Amino acid sequence: MPTFIVLSTLTDDGAETLVKNPERIKEVNQELERDFGVRVVAQYAVLGPYDFVNVVEAEDAATVARAMLHLASRGSVKTMTLEAIPVADLIARLK
């Protein structure tokens, strides 16, 4: 299944929600899989311009785009999504 990296930044409302309910992170991950078919494989809170680095799997880029648009529409997070290509696949294509 294709892998994507989602860099996310909380809005003020999103940060307030997490301070009040830290478990919301897990709830959103479950919603992504249940409602959109996007599975969170790994997730890290990070320092710097982004708040989280998320490794997700989905059927295709359109599936991830749909899920991220729905998340953004809530006003709690902004995302940047990158398609990840396994290095072995890249090497094979370069030969």
From Swiss-Prot:
Classification via InterPro entries: GYD/TTHA1554
Oligomer and partners: Interacts with glutamine synthetase (TTHA1329) and cystathionine beta-lyase (TTHA1620), but proteins do not form a ternary complex.
Function of the protein: Binds to glutamine synthetase and cystathionine beta-lyase. May be utilized for the efficient use of nitrogen in the global nitrogen regulation of T.thermophilus.
Protein name from the UniProt record: Glutamine synthetase and cystathionine beta-lyase binding protein
Species, as recorded: Thermus thermophilus (strain ATCC 27634 / DSM 579 / HB8)
Lineage, uppermost ranks: Bacteria, Thermotogati, Deinococcota, Deinococci, Thermales
